[in-house]
């Protein structure tokens, strides 16, 4: 399935149905009173977060969503039926913005969450509504109110427990394919990964979701190489596994470049817990490995992990380090939540 993380859609709620002008007709009653019913309310436009989706590709080929109009009122004080709603189904992590792209309308973070985007127009009153003591036989009814219409921008930010970051060709996709059932494209050239990918890691009878973020380059926070789009997916990750290619010219410089982009982008990316690892260790001789580790240790300010997704070296240690960080965060979040008041 193709990946799409931004789409522009047009939504319109249904118009209200018109009221009815009608009079009661019965045997032996020459002038029956008014009995025109009200029109039905127009359908609403909803957005719903559903399970099983991880892309907005459905909105590439269909951009217009219109709810049905309300039915007209009828005689015998019969009100019109409400128009059918229109529902946009999106994956968790989707944000809904107004047409200006800046005004946030809804943030869909949990499966089952529903938000009304446009309310249907009210139905018009039938002539029975206008009966008064001085006007016993009104001959007019209201038309229904028009629905709301607007253009909206949908943006998807993947929700994952941990995210893989690094320069292009750092071995992120190979790592994801090794530890999950995901099948990302893997090749020995930069920018093989063009879209973020997700996989479920099962380690030591525990599970967490891992996201493969496409490689970042210098200027990514300004949009170079679609970097700002990729960095947006890092916002929802709780822990970062920063892979630095061991075969790069200088591991320390490669690490600092990615850190600068995370800091420049903002949104708290540079403050997220980070696990640093030197990847592709199987391709290095002992002296080069020692030199690159020393460079990376100085740049990161701590001892990095050594791993090779191809040979399996250090993979389990990296997964346990991620799980430990997630457990620590979970404990801190539980302590931060206010305790429920005691009730007898």
Curated annotation (Swiss-Prot):
<dbReference type="GO" id="GO:0005737">
    <property type="term" value="C:cytoplasm"/>
</dbReference>
<comment type="function">
    <text>An essential GTPase which binds GTP, GDP and possibly (p)ppGpp with moderate affinity, with high nucleotide exchange rates and a fairly low GTP hydrolysis rate. Plays a role in control of the cell cycle, stress response, ribosome biogenesis and in those bacteria that undergo differentiation, in morphogenesis control.</text>
</comment>
<dbReference type="InterPro" id="IPR006073">
    <property type="entry name" value="GTP-bd"/>
</dbReference>
<feature type="binding site">
    <location>
        <begin position="279"/>
        <end position="282"/>
    </location>
    <ligand>
        <name>GTP</name>
    </ligand>
</feature>
<dbReference type="InterPro" id="IPR014100">
    <property type="entry name" value="GTP-bd_Obg/CgtA"/>
</dbReference>
<dbReference type="GO" id="GO:0003924">
    <property type="term" value="F:GTPase activity"/>
</dbReference>
<keyword id="KW-0547">Nucleotide-binding</keyword>
<feature type="binding site">
    <location>
        <begin position="166"/>
        <end position="173"/>
    </location>
    <ligand>
        <name>GTP</name>
    </ligand>
</feature>
<dbReference type="InterPro" id="IPR036726">
    <property type="entry name" value="GTP1_OBG_dom_sf"/>
</dbReference>
<comment type="subunit">
    <text>Monomer.</text>
</comment>
<keyword id="KW-0479">Metal-binding</keyword>
<feature type="binding site">
    <location>
        <position position="193"/>
    </location>
    <ligand>
        <name>Mg(2+)</name>
    </ligand>
</feature>
<feature type="binding site">
    <location>
        <begin position="191"/>
        <end position="195"/>
    </location>
    <ligand>
        <name>GTP</name>
    </ligand>
</feature>
<dbReference type="InterPro" id="IPR006169">
    <property type="entry name" value="GTP1_OBG_dom"/>
</dbReference>
<feature type="binding site">
    <location>
        <begin position="308"/>
        <end position="310"/>
    </location>
    <ligand>
        <name>GTP</name>
    </ligand>
</feature>
<dbReference type="GO" id="GO:0042254">
    <property type="term" value="P:ribosome biogenesis"/>
</dbReference>
<dbReference type="GO" id="GO:0005525">
    <property type="term" value="F:GTP binding"/>
</dbReference>
<feature type="domain" description="OBG-type G">
    <location>
        <begin position="160"/>
        <end position="327"/>
    </location>
</feature>
<dbReference type="InterPro" id="IPR045086">
    <property type="entry name" value="OBG_GTPase"/>
</dbReference>
<dbReference type="Pfam" id="PF01926">
    <property type="entry name" value="MMR_HSR1"/>
</dbReference>
<dbReference type="InterPro" id="IPR031167">
    <property type="entry name" value="G_OBG"/>
</dbReference>
<dbReference type="InterPro" id="IPR027417">
    <property type="entry name" value="P-loop_NTPase"/>
</dbReference>
<protein>
    <recommendedName>
        <fullName>GTPase Obg</fullName>
        <ecNumber>3.6.5.-</ecNumber>
    </recommendedName>
</protein>
<feature type="binding site">
    <location>
        <position position="173"/>
    </location>
    <ligand>
        <name>Mg(2+)</name>
    </ligand>
</feature>
<comment type="similarity">
    <text>Belongs to the TRAFAC class OBG-HflX-like GTPase superfamily. OBG GTPase family.</text>
</comment>
<keyword id="KW-0963">Cytoplasm</keyword>
<dbReference type="Pfam" id="PF01018">
    <property type="entry name" value="GTP1_OBG"/>
</dbReference>
<dbReference type="InterPro" id="IPR006074">
    <property type="entry name" value="GTP1-OBG_CS"/>
</dbReference>
<dbReference type="GO" id="GO:0000287">
    <property type="term" value="F:magnesium ion binding"/>
</dbReference>
<keyword id="KW-0378">Hydrolase</keyword>
<feature type="domain" description="Obg">
    <location>
        <begin position="1"/>
        <end position="159"/>
    </location>
</feature>
<keyword id="KW-0342">GTP-binding</keyword>
<feature type="binding site">
    <location>
        <begin position="212"/>
        <end position="215"/>
    </location>
    <ligand>
        <name>GTP</name>
    </ligand>
</feature>
<keyword id="KW-0460">Magnesium</keyword>
């Amino acid at each position: 399935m193709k990946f799409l993380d931004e789409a522009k859609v047009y939504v319109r709620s249904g118009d209200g149905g018109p009221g009815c002008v009608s009079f009661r007709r019965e045997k032996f009653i020459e002038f029956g009173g008014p009995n025109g019913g009200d029109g039905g309310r127009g359908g609403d436009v909803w957005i719903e977060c559903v399970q099983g989706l991880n892309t907005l590709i459905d909105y590439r080929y269909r951009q217009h969503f219109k709810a049905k109009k309300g039915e007209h009122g009828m005689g015998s004080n019969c009100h019109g039926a409400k128009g059918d709603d229109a529902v946009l189904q999106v994956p968790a992590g989707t944000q809904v913005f107004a047409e200006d792209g800046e005004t946030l309308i809804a943030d869909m973070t949990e499966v089952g969450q529903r938000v009304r985007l446009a309310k249907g127009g009210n139905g018009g009153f039938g002539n029975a509504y206008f009966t008064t003591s001085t006007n016993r036989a009104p001959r007019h009814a209201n038309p229904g109110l028009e629905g709301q219409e607007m253009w909206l921008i949908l943006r998807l930010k993947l929700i994952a427990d941990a995210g893989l970051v690094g320069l292009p060709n750092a071995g992120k996709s190979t790592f994801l394919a090794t530890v999950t059932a995901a099948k990302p494209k893997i090749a020995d050239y930069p920018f093989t990964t063009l879209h973020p990918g997700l996989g479920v890691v099962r380690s030591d009878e525990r599970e967490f979701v891992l996201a493969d973020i496409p490689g970042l380059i210098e200027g990514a926070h300004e949009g170079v190489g679609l970097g700002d789009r990729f960095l947006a997916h890092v916002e929802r990750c709780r822990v970062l596994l920063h892979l630095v290619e061991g075969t790069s010219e200088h591991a320390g410089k490669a690490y600092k470049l990615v850190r600068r982009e995370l800091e420049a982008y903002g949104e708290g990316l540079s403050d997220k817990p980070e696990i640093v690892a030197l990847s592709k260790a199987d391709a290095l001789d002992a002296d080069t490995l020692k030199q690159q580790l020393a460079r990376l240790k100085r740049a990161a300010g701590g001892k990095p992990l050594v791993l090779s997704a191809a040979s399996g070296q250090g993979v389990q240690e990296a997964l346990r380090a991620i799980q430990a960080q997630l457990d620590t965060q979970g404990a801190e979040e539980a302590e931060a939540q206010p305790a429920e008041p005691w009730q007898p």
